[in-house]
Amino acid sequence: MASKKGVRLIITLECTECRSNPDKRSAGVSRYTTSKNRRNTTGRLELKKFCTHCNKHTVHKEIK
């Protein structure tokens, strides 16, 4: 018998300013992993997190 997938998904959050900002502290793109509830949050997740490459708090969006 196969079990159903859970409601929670593991997602990746990526900094939105790292791609377009040439004046950042170091090369690369900041990424965080977290989980979200598929039933409660159906859309893409956006959180303000600290970006180590930009050296400030920026908006991180969910990528697939």
Swiss-Prot record:
Gene3D superfamilies: Ribosomal protein L33. It comes from Gloeothece citriformis (strain PCC 7424) (Cyanothece sp. (strain PCC 7424)). Belongs to the bacterial ribosomal protein bL33 family. The keyword Ribosomal protein applies. It comes from the Bacteria. Disulfide bonds: none annotated. The keyword Ribosomal protein applies. Coiled coil: none annotated. It holds the Pfam family Ribosomal_L33. GO terms for biological process: translation. NCBIfam families: PRK00504.1 (NF001764), PRK00595.1 (NF001860), rpmG_bact (TIGR01023). This is Large ribosomal subunit protein bL33. Keywords: Ribonucleoprotein, Ribosomal protein. The gene is rpmG. One of its GO terms (cellular component) is ribosome. HAMAP family: Ribosomal_bL33 (MF_00294). GO terms for molecular function: structural constituent of ribosome.
